[in-house]
Amino acid sequence: MQSRSQHFSLRAAFFFSGALSLSSGAIAAAVQTEPESEKLEIGDSQPGNYLSALIASADRDTPAAEVYYREALRVDPRNPDLLERAFAAALSNGDETSASSLGERLLGRDPNNNLARLAIAIRDIEQGQFASARAHLAGAEAMRGRDVTAALLTAWCYAGQSDLRHALDALDRIRDPSVFAFRDYHAGLIAALLGNVAEAQRRLKSAHDDDKNSLRFADAYARLLSAQGDSAGARKIYEDFSNIIPHHPLIQRALADLKTNQALDPVVHNAKEGAAEALYGVGSAGSRQGDELPALVYLRLSLYLRPSSDLTAVTLASLFEQLRQSDQAIAAYGLVPSSSPLKMGADIQIALELDGMGKTDEAMRRLTDIVAERPHDVEGLSALAELQRSAKKYVDAAASYDRAIAAVGIPQRDNWTLFYFRGICYERSKQWPKAEADFKKALELYPDQPLVLNYLGYSWVDQGLNLEEAFKMLRKAVDLRPSDGYIVDSLGWAHYKLGQYAEAAKTLEKAINLKPADPILNDHLGDAYWRVDRRIEAHFQWNHARDMSPDSEDLPVILKKIEVGLPDVTTQAPAPKASLQKEGGG
């Protein structure tokens, strides 16, 4: 049975969502942390700057949009549309100082602008002006509807004034059952901050009991128990969480600290950090639920209040990855403090983002430096091996996987990928006996793993080995992953390799329906059609494959087939490679 908190609706929390949507053109442009106005050419006319701002917004270039809107507004300061767009661009770009200033002007025109009230309230919280912040939150229309976000921030404002009774009262007015765990979590943090340990323990236990999958709920409750001298209770909470989500760096650090009897810091140390935690929670929910634009604003504001928050920085970076803004993802990962347990993972993600941007050499250098600094870190070694493998440096990648496997010690089920990918590297570097042994080891650790079944099964078919067992493996893989076009393709291509062309065509058609835009699969289906005398359809598929940016070594082969078709079976050239070039998974 799912916990109530797992149904937490982001829209229930976003009392500013209406205002956000009014300025979606500017907010959707969010890509960078700091405007780089020195690189921009400011126009001489207001219409020119306004047009540049619109173009920058369409290109998701918020720094430029903010600069151009500001310049356009400077020429036409009474334009309400420009004012709101400039405000939204500043807010989504993380420029809280400008946003709050523009927000003041917006409120002069529209006292019910909720987004402007939010920006000003957050500024007041940052400055310790909690009464003023509460006044702005109370002035928002949605506050009268018992909004979750407003209630959370109001409660933390009361906490900043050491008023526990009113803080808890603000939270307990929340009536949505889906948010009760979130409510109790913040009530517990406030009670702990203000010294009511019994109330803190009751509330945090309630939140944790409601959702044991929540990292924040588990961490906060365990830290409270540790502070009260219950190290065994804290350890059990962390260990139980590790059974659900293994190897989380924050949990591993906390367990290590408990083992050496080090004190665990509370989740928040003051009301400002508590408000940041509330914004982080709502923004994180938005990121998970695909409500990306409001989530971006909340995460930006959270970092404004607590710039050192590692979880917020990582969540913001992940959001930028969703938005395919690699530069901004890298900048956000760079905000993770060097002392954080998440720093290693953040540095690895920076390298992977660089690789995705085509900066593979720089990415490789970064990962090499990481591994040199921490030579026994499995995560770093695995990332380096993955990058080497994707660059087709199979011998180097296998050596990195060697080191990762050695660092693991006794392999467990979740280490199957190390053997699987090392096996691929061995297979690609013509070391089949080693590859076969690794694939078998991966299956020993994770029986019936479909990707491994697919790769080993096809490899056996390709070499004419263990054919009966190989086809059992391939069929099993398809049964387990019937919607994986690459795995279905492998079964079809195995039929083709054995001359079972009618069955191959039938199976490969299923693969194409699942993965229509892959050049290898289209090439395979074209070959199968040719063998069953469907020549026009064969050319159609080969032409598709040609137009889908195939690998450079495949393109000449495809062009040759388009020109002259396939040779007779008795004089056939070596068959094209199978789709396990994709490692069997989509």
Question: Model-flagged regions — what are they?
Answer:
Residues 57, 91, 125, 159, ...:
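Position-specific recognition of the canonical hydrophobic site in helix A of tetratricopeptide repeat
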Residues 85-86, 119, 153, 186, ...:
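Canonical tetratricopeptide repeat
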Residues 75, 108-110, 142-143, 174-177, ...:
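Structural marker of alpha-solenoid helical repeat scaffolds
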Residues 54, 88, 122, 156, ...:
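Residue-level recognition of tetratricopeptide repeat
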Residues 26-86, 91-101, 111, 255-258, ...:
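N-terminal leader/linker segments that initiate helical-solenoid repeat arrays
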